[in-house]
Structures are given as structure tokens and as C-alpha cells.
Amino acid sequence: MTPLLKLIKKQDFIILIILILLIPVVTRLNKRINFIYILFTSNYITLILNIAFLVMMYKKVMIFNDLSHTLITRMGYKNTKQTIYVFMVIITLLFLTILYSFLFLVYGFSHMSIKLLLMLVIYSLLYLFEIFIIYLQFNRKSNILYIALPIIINLVCHYMFF
């Protein structure tokens, strides 16, 4: 797992942090109830931040595809798939934790209901599902559907349900 952490480039990490820090500027602080409301109603988070992260994860899978023969030879096919999947889930959960923490610190936790917390859990599970679709690209030929489908799911769920 530790060698895979080297694949997280400082440049990618800095770009994501800058995009997260821009949330208050883009969404404006006025008339916003709490951080979950911001998460679901902000087009910036869905259109820019989430898609940027999905594209970055897709690029990581493409790097894994280039290294797949070496990794499979050293670790075995099953161990390689498990390690890469765990890596992607951990990075996704880390991203969501940073995003949720920042939104909580900036916008607070007022007017919270069980319905909003349930929506937050559903949003997180949806995001993990999108990452799983990207993960399916591992050890296969490059196909644009593996990135287009998560982006379409992200947009449809944002505009139809949230």
C-alpha cells in the first residue's frame, strides 16, 4: 500500500485543496443553512470539484494499467486488484473527509435533521459507487465510458435528486 501512496502527486493534492478552499468564494456565505445544504445545492462542488476528483482517479487507474503486468507478476492478480481497490477507496474517503470537514468548519452544523444526514450517507455511497465504476477500468483496454458514466451519474443525481 505504501508504494501506491507515491502515486498521489503533490500537484494533484494542491489543486484539490485549492478547489476546496474556493468553495466559500464561489458559493457565497449568505442564505446558506448548513454544510450538507451547501453540498447538495452547490453546482460548483458537483460540476468542478467532484468531476476533477473523478478524472484524477481515472488517471490513476490508467497509471495502474501501465504498471499492471509488473504488479500482477510481483503480487498476484487477486492481491493487485484488492490493493488497488483499497487504495482508491481510502483516497476517496480521505477526499470526502477533507471536503466534509472544510464545509462543516465554514458553514456549521445548524438546522440538522435525520433526512439531511441520510442524504449525506447516500451521497458518500454514490461517490464510492462512481469510484468503483472507474476501478473497473483496471487491467482493461482504455474506454471513455469508464469516466463518462460516473460523471453522468454524478450530474443526474445532483440535478434529479438533490
Q: Could you describe each region identified by the protein language model?
A:
Residues 1-13:
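Aromatic- and glycine-rich beta-strand/loop motifs that create alpha-glucan
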Residues 1-4, 151-162:
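Short amphipathic alpha-helical segments
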Residues 11-17, 45-48:
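Alpha-helical transmembrane segments
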Residues 15-32, 158-162:
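Alpha-helical transmembrane segments of multi-pass membrane proteins
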Residues 16-20, 142-157:
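Central hydrophobic cores of alpha-helical transmembrane segments
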Residues 25-49, 55-57, 83-140:
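Secretory targeting signals
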Residues 61-90:
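Helix-loop-helix units of permease transmembrane domains in multi-pass membrane transporters
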Residues 68-78, 103-111, 143-149:
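Alpha-helical membrane-embedding segments
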